[in-house]
């Protein structure tokens, strides 16, 4: 057996092992759902207070390096750490990073020769999680390591392919993971299936429940005046326990059918806010400018602002390759506090968390 065959066989065994764990977790769903969930709501971030009332929070960002994630026999993702400072009146904000604190997390588990293309970050049950949009694996990020936790299958959960998870949020006692939120099509917009329109509810025990959100995503894009074959792509969705509302920052949208060649220039500056039942929506424009080559990739509510302030990440791609990423701060009414701040490196940052 060749060295490459050995490597592929090892990856297969690893993936099979994780799949078995995920299957076992799923069989425990009824048992765990009967038990009362006890969730650890501890924060993972540090906060520094200044004499003028300003506060500075520690933040973490994670990258999706796409093809560049391959590193020998492993796959990697870059983790960056920094700080967000917000004035006492919430009118000013500043971001800076500590390059010396950057590090990589890696894995041996891949699908189709790709892995560790991490999307979004979420603090859930006192731990920090991310999702690999290639394998469907949820990883716990801890001690500069990526620890496999739960495997998510695509669509309704009865297919072999891993779920292309793009956003993560926490609602009550569940971690909720969503996909692109549009119909899966060919590069020319020909319909294939609805698998990216499902969401996954994950309990603290790792039990998974699959829910079809097709009607939800249709209502979200319809609120912005988009009808099929027009589309809206989602990578940044959060539930607010304070407002009891859903917040969507679409990455791309268009009244035209999907085209891979055109999609890179269909970025948005739209915030869609929905009620808890996801039946009623309002649309907010963020700022007055919209560089359509940049699209939202992730966001979080800034702590101690009653979920009035948002810190968001936009990324820019050209011919399928990352060009740059930008951070901004604005309120839920669309007023910009910190305009798009260029982050260092030609990276596609896809996750941000206060940690």
UniProtKB/Swiss-Prot annotation:
Function noted in UniProt: Hydrolyzes UDP and to a lesser extent GDP. By preventing the accumulation of NDP, may promote the reglucosylation of incompletely folded glycoproteins in the endoplasmic reticulum following the unfolded protein response.
Subcellular location: Endomembrane system
The name this protein goes by in its record: Apyrase apy-1
InterPro entries xref list: Apyrase (IPR009283), Apyrase_sf (IPR036258)
Entry's induction text: By ER stress.
Membrane-related topology note: Single-pass type II membrane protein
Annotated gene: apy-1
GO biological process: ATF6-mediated unfolded protein response; determination of adult lifespan; endoplasmic reticulum unfolded protein response; gastrulation; GDP catabolic process; IRE1-mediated unfolded protein response; nematode pharynx development; proteoglycan biosynthetic process
Cofactor(s) needed for function: Ca(2+)
Topological domains annotated Cytoplasmic: 1-6
One cellular component term from this protein's GO annotations in UniProt: endomembrane system
Catalytic activity: a ribonucleoside 5'-diphosphate + H2O = a ribonucleoside 5'-phosphate + phosphate + H(+)
Location, primary (coarse class): membrane
Classification of source organism: Eukaryota, Metazoa, Ecdysozoa, Nematoda, Chromadorea
Transmembrane domains' residue ranges: 7-29
Lumenal-side positions: 30-355
Pfam families xref list: Apyrase (PF06079)
EC number in record: 3.6.1.6
Residues bearing glycans: 30, 291
């Amino acid at each position: 057996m060749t060295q490459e065959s050995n490597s592929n066989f090892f990856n297969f065994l690893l993936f099979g092992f994780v799949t078995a764990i995920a299957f076992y977790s799923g069989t425990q769903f009824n048992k765990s759902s009967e038990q009362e969930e006890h969730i650890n709501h501890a924060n993972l971030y540090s906060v520094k207070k200044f004499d003028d009332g300003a506060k500075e929070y520690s933040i973490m960002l994670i990258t999706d390096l796409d093809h560049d994630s391959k590193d020998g026999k492993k796959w990697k993702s870059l983790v960056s750490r920094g700080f967000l400072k917000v004035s006492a009146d919430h009118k000013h904000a500043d971001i800076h990073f500590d390059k010396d604190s950057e590090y990589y997390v890696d894995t041996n588990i891949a699908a189709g020769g790709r892995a560790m293309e991490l999307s979004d970050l979420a603090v859930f049950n006192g731990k920090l999680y991310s999702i690999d949009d290639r394998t469907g694996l949820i990883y716990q990020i801890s001690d500069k390591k990526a620890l496999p936790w739960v495997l998510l299958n695509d669509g309704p959960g009865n297919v072999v392919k891993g779920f292309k998870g793009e956003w993560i949020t926490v609602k009550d006692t569940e971690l909720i993971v969503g996909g692109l939120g549009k119909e899966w099509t060919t590069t020319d917009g020909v319909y294939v299936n609805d698998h990216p329109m499902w969401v996954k509810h994950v309990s603290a025990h790792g039990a998974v429940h699959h829910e079809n959100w097709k009607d939800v995503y249709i209502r979200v894009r319809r609120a912005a005046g988009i009808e099929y074959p027009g589309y809206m792509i989602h990578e940044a969705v959060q539930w607010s326990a304070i407002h009891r509302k859903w917040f969507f920052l679409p990455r791309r949208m268009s009244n035209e059918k999907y085209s891979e060649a055109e999609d890179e220039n269909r970025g948005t500056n739209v915030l869609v806010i929905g009620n808890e039942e996801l039946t009623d929506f309002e649309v907010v424009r963020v700022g007055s400018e919209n560089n359509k080559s940049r699209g939202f990739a992730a966001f979080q509510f800034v702590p101690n602002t009653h979920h009035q302030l948002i810190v968001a990440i936009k990324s820019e791609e050209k011919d399928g390759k990352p060009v740059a990423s930008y951070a901004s701060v604005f309120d839920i009414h669309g007023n910009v506090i910190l305009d798009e701040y260029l982050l260092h490196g030609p990276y596609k940052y896809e996750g941000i968390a206060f940690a």
